[in-house]
Amino acid sequence: MSEQQALSQIYLDANATTPVLPKAAKAALSTMETMFGNPSSSHISGLQAKQIMDETRRKAVQVLGAGSGQVIFTSGATEGIQTGILSALCAAKGKMHAHKQYSILYGATEHKAVPESLKHWNKVLEIDAQIKAIPVDEKGTLDYDFIAKEVPNALMICTMAVNNETGVYQDLSALEMVIRGHNADVFWMVDCVQALGKRGLELANTSIDYAPFSGHKLYAPKGIGFVYIREGAPFTPFIAGGGQEGGLRSGTENLPGLAALNVIFDELLDNGDGVFANAGQLQLFRSQLALALKNAFPTVVFNHDFANSVPTTLNFAIPGFSSKEIMDLFDAANLRVSSGSACSSKVTRSFVLDAMGLPAWQSESAIRMSFGPAVTQQQIDQACDRIHHCAQALGHSCLLNATGNIDEKTQLQGLVQFKVGGSCSWLYADPVTKTAVIIDPLPELSNRLLTILQCQQLQLVAAIDTHGHADHQSGRIALAKAHLDNQHADYLGWPVETTEVEIAQRRFAAISIGDKYLVRIATPGHTEDSISLVLCDKDKLLSGALDVSYVFCGDLVLMGSLGRTNFSTSDAKQMYQSLQSLAQLVGDQSLLCPSHDYHNEFVTNFKAESSRNSLLNDVLNGAVTVEQFVERKVELDKNINDQTGEEIMCGAFTGSCTKKHLQEYNGSELKEKLQRDSQVKLIDIREPHEYALNHDQEFDMNVPLTRLTDFICQQQHNKSQELILVCRSGSRSQVAANALARLGFDNVGHLKGGYALCQSS
């Protein structure tokens, strides 16, 4: 597969890991090829290896200002954390008094390795102390009053020097005064991983007992780290065995890692090649990146105060965009950033920002951009240029009002699906008349929808809710105020002025959208005001034939479920009638577009749902009476467990998420497939802005997930066409392929691992 645009990688995720400094890599390689002795051996090769280890330790003591404290080499920060916690809690256990309740304190914004390790050793050692999180304020600073109150009864307190997500640093001197002023003997561990090379450290001048560090966060290889132990602090080996490290940490020393650290320490001590920028220069780099973000995304919000943050980290959010959307966008531009800690990449929001009390949208949209001291001016310049192109790409797909274009703006036509959590909004646009209708608009999408309407110069015909939603406020009001000020409509947004059409000898109200009718059908049950909206061909309907494009069914039918009927305005008897009535009108193959999609299945039809939902199948086949349906529906709805602060589920899942068998290809297999089979269609399913930034020449088309339902509609009569889907990581392509297979597309495959693994191979 050949790339249309060759974009070099710009790596701005240094808080997750860093490339190995070339000189450090060379030193490591030397210890693998020539100076490969075991430091514990007494022959010359061993002595040479031991000299490297001793020299590295001596430099570590200098860098840390460790004085007479000890520096023990480990496999990384997590081992260092275990070492500090185990040592402290073993010693603390011996001082505990029976029948007294103790606590263990940690900062609420600590890396998850700390609280999880505390819970583990608290249980294993049978200490049974209360583990308490120290609150932080909106700037990420620890609550000194809380510490003063709780630390007298604490066995151990864990804080961090610099936060890995926000770059916020703690004033260790002020913190020490609070801690020692209220408990002179409590064991104190400080996670210093992100402080190395960014903050001055004079550990011997503090009462910090334990401080773990990691090599790969500062240009050394993965698998090497070290931990500082204050002179006189208790110590329990985490790893016992051959007695290496003076019996403090057994296991053959990682000589290549030590050799690399040796080079890094030279840079920190100004004895190297001078590749590390000073603090002033790093601040200028941050300012340049911040300005580029502001220019590209004028509404950007920074999630931390630069005044109490190291200059190598920027944490920001862009209103209206999830962190995943920005991650995917930047990744398409080969600009590497993250949505938080790399140790928790599946988390959808930041617990750090939650602890700081920031609004939920900022936590859910947070992006971390981080660089190390070896970054160059050229790299920062390139990053700023790439950020500008990312904004242009969003403008290209009308998600941002950006000046300038990568290409002509993509004309919007057909159906687009938008999601917030499990809730869906639908926009249908007719390119000829430049008219549009929006179904079930979500308030979180108001700005995005308004931007699209403006950018595409679309006239909004109506913004309609399929029912009054219990789980969210409608975004219809904002849309109507901007585009439908003179329209008279009911409280769901259905216009007063309509056309009357006939379907199956029944009369319905309809409105026109280009060459389509949008027909309103009352389908009460989930709520008494529930309606379904059928988009169908205007000319065929006038000729007496119903040709359905889409059925916007609200919460009548959900993927794998039926809408709940246990609200005060629900009526299961009416749902029974609505299901039968709608199915008779539209048939079992018409595409149903619900207002919720909890399992990323996008769209469905009565045939697909009947095959996995026995209750629905029985209703449509007349196998249950209305009374039996009501009885079974009551039992079904008992499976819904509403929780305060969580998304309200609008139906109990009854179906199966069993994945269909899909053909999966790796990069070489796909290349061979394309060479021997010219009939296969290769489809890039990333969003248009990702596709615009970077895509391969072989692709027949771009079908983003937001347009997948539209694609399914267009391909309804060509389900045997062989399709191979590709995305960034393989996740979206697998989800899309499963959705297609579930609806009868029987020749679908995808690129396993996506662009990421294809490029690496």
Predicted regions and their residues:
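Active-site metal-binding motif and surrounding structural segment of the metallo-beta-lactamase
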Residues: 444-494, 502-503, 510, 724
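Accessory terminal helices/loops
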Residues: 397-416, 422, 577-681, 687-688, ...
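Short amphipathic alpha-helix with an adjacent loop that forms part of the alpha/beta core around
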Residues: 143-153, 448-456, 510-514, 672-674, ...
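Pyridoxal 5′-phosphate
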Residues: 1-411, 421
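Catalytic core of the metallo-beta-lactamase
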Residues: 412-456, 500-600, 605, 723
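Active-site neighborhood of phospho(di)ester-bond hydrolases with catalytic His/Asp-centered motifs
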Residues: 75, 107, 191, 212-215, ...
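Catalytic cysteine-centered active loop of the rhodanese-like fold, especially the PTP/DSP P-loop
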Residues: 711-760
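Di-metal (Zn2+ and/or Mg2+/Mn2+) metal-binding site signature of metallo-dependent hydrolases
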Residues: 82, 217-218, 459-482, 526-534, ...
